[in-house]
Amino acid sequence: MTIDRSFQTKNAAERARMQALVARLTDPDLQRSLGHRWTVADALLHLAFWDLRAVVLMDRFEREGVGASPMDVETANDTVWAMGRGLPARAAAELAVRAAETAARRIEALPDQLVEAIRARPDAPFTLARHEHWREHLDDIERGLR
């Protein structure tokens, strides 16, 4: 039986959107405030962190089986913001693109059984539909640049 992986098409579309956006961002754009102390670069670094966390968890789940991975989201986001203070804005933007690509490729390589196991958990620590998170923040960035 084939499982529904239609989310991968949406992941690809939002990933392409991210790549195009990052390619046209200027250094002043990356420093533009989005409110709540976040800049465009901070939002992109935030995406990179959550994508790389998903990759680490997929690797773990493939070795050990799918399980919970509780996290204090506010503390994680505050930590990402603090890390951004020491990272060049352009590097954060480029990391976001690489992390999205890594997450998408990792998801595409997951065996169907693991995809089903992750999607079946009500407490899944991340979504395979990465496009949802990307879209939310790319929309914020594009609004902030207007």
Model-assigned labels for residue ranges:
Residues 1, 8, 33, 86, ...:
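A generic helix-loop boundary/linker signal
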Residues 1-6, 52-102, 146:
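Short, helix-capping/interhelical loops that line the mouth of catalytic, cofactor-
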Residues 11-18, 40-55, 81-89, 93-103, ...:
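Alpha-helical transition-metal enzyme core signature, strongest for iron centers
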Residues 22, 61-62, 107-108:
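Hydrophobic residues in alpha-helical segments
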Residues 27-75, 112-146:
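Short, contiguous alpha-helical
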